[in-house]
Structures are given as C-alpha cells and as structure tokens.
Swiss-Prot record:
SUPFAM superfamilies: Agglutinin HPA-like. This is ATP synthase subunits region ORF 7. The lineage of its organism: Bacteria, Pseudomonadati, Pseudomonadota, Alphaproteobacteria, Rhodobacterales. GO terms for cellular component: cell surface; phagocytic vesicle; protein complex involved in cell adhesion. InterPro entries: Galactose-binding_lectin, H-type_lectin_dom_sf, H-type_lectin_domain. GO terms for biological process: cell-cell adhesion. One of its GO terms (molecular function) is oligosaccharide binding. PANTHER family: DISCOIDIN-1 SUBUNIT A-RELATED-RELATED. It comes from the Bacteria.
Amino acid sequence: MLRLGASVGVHQGSRILFSDFADGGQMWTGNGPREYRLDVTFPEPFTRTPAVTVGLSMWDMDHKTNSRMDIGAENITPQGFQIVFKTWGDTRIARVRADWLAIGSVRDDEDWEIE
C-alpha cells in the first residue's frame, strides 16, 4: 500500500476480466448473461470504506457491432470490492482489462484505542 501522509492509503491494480474470443464465451457470442463480476481483495484493509474508481485499460471488440459497455465498482468494503462489467444488444467483446484505484483511511502507527 502506498501511504499519502500518516492516515491515507492507496491500493491500485490491473486485471484482465475475461478473454471470451478464445473459447466462444458469452461476451463474444452474445448468448447468455452479458455481465461479468470480479472480486478484488485489498492486500491490506482500509479502516473505513474507501473511494474506488475503475476504468478500462484495454477493450478488444468486434468492429461490426455497436460499442456498448458499463463498468464500475460495487459492494465496496474496507476489505475489497467487485468490478462489474456489462454490455448489451449486439455488442461482441473479445476481451477487457480494467484498472482500479482505491483511496481511503488507514491505520496510523500513532493511532491507539481506548477501551
């Protein structure tokens, strides 16, 4: 975790979500659910729910169909979140890579608890 000051931390990552053209998966064929979810667990948890952003860093698609997609973060907790990628209609997607960034409060060495 990168620390920005005493009590703010940053986690970041990059993941290939799917590669459906190789095996005729649902995002490529257009059959079945057109949603993919990936659980991300932070290597070190935050002390509170962080702010998380998700973006596309690679999008390989069929040029003969419309380009439609929605990507975001859901179910965010101090321990992790889900990347959610969706498409619809005639869109055919071969593969997608998503990058993410989480910023939030972390435990400081100077923190102490009173019981």
